[in-house]
């Protein structure tokens, strides 16, 4: 049996939580949009790099944004960053850095097997799931944050 005032306390706590929820969501979105706006130079650099290597160069910034993303974008960021991280891991395993690529081409010293692995990991960045996730992130940035990303 519950104490007599327990239901009133639970109702009051739930009511307060529901009143604060829109503000918390708004604060999260506002912080995310502020971070997006502050990182405009990074997005411009990524847009100017057709090879996609800029995504790796600015991975920590992308992870910071993903961590700040509103709840309704978490899945998109997870999918997008998962592909970027997998590509970075493949490069690391091959012993190359993003800066080792010239005009989007891998270093000549790589074996055929390493080139194939890198090409496969890079192609994952253009997979339907990753493109859909990036499109969702960009659309939200454009509509809500008024920011153009160019992912």
Predicted regions mapped to residue ranges:
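Bacterial signal peptide processing site
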Residues: 25-28, 146
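Alpha-helical segments in soluble extracytoplasmic regions
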Residues: 39-99, 115-117
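Ser/Thr/Pro/Gly-rich low-complexity linker/stalk segments immediately outside membranes or between
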Residues: 27-35
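Sec-dependent bacterial lipoprotein signal peptides
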Residues: 1-23
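Short, flexible coil/linker elements and helix-boundary hinge sites characteristic
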Residues: 4, 92-95, 146, 150
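C-terminal amphipathic alpha-helix
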Residues: 39-47, 103-151
